[in-house]
């Protein structure tokens, strides 16, 4: 019995397939327009429910009108990429039509599409046409429409009642048009809208209450609109919003007030905005936020203290490909217990503090590769056995500094270096090297530094005044983060401002030159070299740093001394803790230019030069030399008298005796003559060539040469 039931079921299945095949064949042969494809295809409703639909596919046929012999059973009509600009009544008999695709055609007006009486239509594609406006009630017959794609057109005007009748609309794509305003009245007719994409429109700005009628909206995309600011009440009414994108705008700060009005937000995209810093309160009390993206921000330099605060459900933070992001405060995260993934790769970070990582109890993975990492005490935690955090792409983690470790893998270096304290280093790009401000404006200079122990930050003004957090001044104010505020700047405030970061190990500095209305009053020189003593064969030079801009324990990373005249040029590296230098083995009565160049760890350089002429050799003889010379002259005089008498006595001697006498006199005179100065004082380079071939040849290379002058300097 079971066998017969199985055979009967199989027979019925074959019969059903045969009938379907015959039906499809009949549809294709008798009711399918020429060149089109007519068949039953899978179809998904706007709610992603699977169905099968009778589909007529006439895409890419260069049609100028809709085929006339369409079956009334057609449910999906695809006419994409044709040249249709107008319909007559070809659609009026398609009572079962649920999806219509007119994308990439030549419509300029919605009325010309012929949408009357399409009461079953749920999805309409009109993207990439030439539509310029949407008039009142232009879609009122589409009472069941759930998806409207009208993006990538030329729409500049939408009337207040253009969407009237679309009470069931769930998805609206208006992006990439020419809209200059967003009118909240548009949305009065779409109370059930869940997804709105309106980016890439040249809107003048977002207004307060712009989206208030959209209480059911779940996703809002405001990308590529050149927005510079989001008003505090712009997002009021979006109580169901879960996903928000401000991608590729011109926001210079996080719209924290507006974000507080979307209590259920889960996904926030702020990527590709010129936000300068993420500061305290920017992301605070966003209780449902799960993922945050702050990638590709060309101006982002720092994530400050408590920038992310009380985000109990945040699980993923992406802050990658920010070319200036060089500083994350050790207390950047507060009450972020659920964070599992922290992506910080491809930035300008020199380090991430251990305390930052320890504040994230559920952190599972971190990505800090492709950063110019500073391999010293700040990142020793990376090699700690106490952490179970997985490092993404660890083989791409290389040291950028100190110089002796550059290019080596981080973990290999940290095994060798176990120091617990290290010098401060001011983060690169936190403020520019030069500014030109308008008179009366307020200036903010953000200085950030990393070190162990944590450095103190203060600023020094062009007049040498030290500005600290405790300083009381109407002109200057310093935040605990290191941001100097200069109120209502005037021309007399122009000049050199120096940030100093200092701890027990030493200090680091960075300078910004500020012009006001193009004027710079400050002429102070950071580094000054001067001649302390001049002799015929040596010069003693000294230098000092302007006390207005440097601290006494500032350490340079390198220093170079160069001496130059038209005949010789020599360069030597100077120990960085030296403030005096004795240049020896010089030529008398010769002009020289002596230059000192110093560089800090940021490769910022300061240079100072001085011109000097060595003394004449006659003034350089000491007393012992004079006594020796006098004695030598007396001996030579006596000998000369004896030789003169002998010459008269043997005048009549034989020629060979006269010859021998002449030879003896010549030999004696060679022993007693003065040595030329250019032999007594050979060029500086010869002093360190020792017994080399150059000594034998008696020649000097006049090309600039790197030499060791460790024997000729004096310690301060």
Curated annotation (Swiss-Prot):
Leader peptide range in chain numbering: 1-25
Disulfide bond annotation, renumbered to this chain: 447-499
Composition bias, Basic and acidic residues: 691-700
Annotated SMART domains: IG, IGc2, LRR_SD22, LRR_TYP, LRRCT
Ranges of Polar residues composition bias in the record: 702-716
Biological process (GO), any one: positive regulation of synapse assembly
Domain spans labelled Ig-like C2-type: 424-515
Regions crossing the membrane: 632-652
Region (Disordered): 691-716
Cytoplasmic topological domain residue ranges: 653-716
CDD domains: FN3
Localization per Swiss-Prot or TrEMBL: Membrane
Record keywords, A-Z: Disulfide bond, Glycoprotein, Immunoglobulin domain, Leucine-rich repeat, Membrane, Repeat, Signal, Transmembrane, Transmembrane helix
Keyword Ribonucleoprotein on entry: no
Segments forming domain LRRNT: 26-72
Domain Fibronectin type-III: 525-617
Glycan-carrying positions: 69, 96, 106, 117, 385, 517, 582, 611
CC terms in the record's Gene Ontology section: extracellular matrix; extracellular space; membrane
Span of domain LRRCT: 371-424
Name of the protein: Leucine-rich repeat neuronal protein 1
Source species: Bos taurus
Name of the gene encoding the protein in the UniProt record: LRRN1
